[in-house]
Amino acid sequence: MKYPNLLERFLTYVKVNTRSDETSTTTPSTQSQMDFANNILIPEMKRVGLENVYYLPNGFAIGTLPANDPSFTLKIGFISHMDTADFNAENVQPQVIENYDGGVIPLGQSGFNLDPADFASLHKYKGQTLITTDGTTLLGADDKSGIAEIMTAIEYLSAHPEIKHGEIRVGFGPDEEIGIGADKFDAENFDVDFAYTVDGGPLGELQYETFSAAGAELTFQGRNVHPGTAKDQMINALQLAIDFHNQLPEADRPEKTEGYQGFYHLMNLTGTVEEAQASYIIRDFETDAFENRKAAMQAIADKMNQELGRERVILTLKDQYYNMKQVIEKDMTPIHIAKAVMESLDIQPIIEPIRGGTDGSKISFMGIPTPNLFAGGENMHGRFEYVSLETMERAVDTIIGIVSYQEK
């Protein structure tokens, strides 16, 4: 095995519960992420050869591998996140399936199975080593595979000084899954020309386009009277919420869109006749389309208020992150390098938009162009999550190839 510590490192990481908490007011949102960084990652970062290793109050563990050849002038960063998604992460018991035979994989004693009939991606991995869940938790390959791959690449480079490279910065951060991890990223002191998040999915993913994203919070104010005498008096706040929703295009919902299509997504609807609340997320790739979606919601609210004779529909819009393509397309060097390295490794680059966001979305707008590399995970965020060890090894190869790349 080229990277003998990769599997054990990954298994150690995923057994630690680092689930983030969107209701928390602290950064990191959970103490477990802080403990994971200080008790496991920081000591290991030092062991694998990183220097100037420290932990910031913003939740990031940072380290540097100095250049070993002055002809490599580019300084490159690699970033992954510690937290896992909103699914049970307590007592993760990963299964290691060696030489996968292409059949159904029972997930422990849970009664759940990984079945190629349900998950066609499994067909790609026959003969490989797969790491799965036991059916009671997620796995945490998103994004502990990325952390393990970066750590393993640094370990390998430290042990092989004949591989020449420039300065490398590493950052492991919190709370990506709840969308706030990069808000306090110290870009000024993460001194690199560009970086990569190692937070993608299957082999070959190379992404530099994300959604632009906003959140919409709506309050609907009704007027409650006895339903027996309600004619021309009652204003049902729940009905206002329904009326608002029905004025949004039915085709512009997540379950009906793909590729570069944007959407409105109703996340939550609660209330009574007197008052109701609705939460939406708004997503699109193009700036004009993104702005038009927000304007359309405001126009619906304004129209309803005009018809109601007073402000009963209160809309608050808040931008969350923007399509990092706006930054990265100004200098495609990180994409050209990653693509060239993958091709040299016989990896077919898969350059597609991310129908979501990464920490790189925000970090790019802080002045560090940060596209996304594959980390290997499949079926992320749930009990059917799995990852191929061979794909993780290829991610390590890619990281090493990027830092040692020079134009011929």
Swiss-Prot record:
InterPro entries documented for this protein: ArgE/DapE_CS, Bact_exopeptidase_dim_dom, Peptidase_M20, Peptidase_M20_dimer, Peptidase_M20B
Enzyme class: hydrolase
Active site location: 83, 176
UniProtKB keywords: Aminopeptidase, Cytoplasm, Hydrolase, Metal-binding, Metalloprotease, Protease, Zinc
Names of required cofactors: Zn(2+)
Catalytic activity reported: Release of the N-terminal residue from a tripeptide
This enzyme's EC code(s): 3.4.11.4
Residue positions binding Zn(2+) 2: 142, 177, 381
Pfam families cross-referenced by the UniProt entry: M20_dimer, Peptidase_M20
Entry binding sites for Zn(2+) 1: 81, 142, 199
Keyword Cell cycle carried by entry: no
Function: Cleaves the N-terminal amino acid of tripeptides.
Record-linked HAMAP family: Aminopeptidase_M20 (MF_00550)
Family listed: Belongs to the peptidase M20B family.
Name by which UniProt lists this protein: Peptidase T
Lineage of source species: Bacteria, Bacillati, Bacillota, Bacilli, Lactobacillales
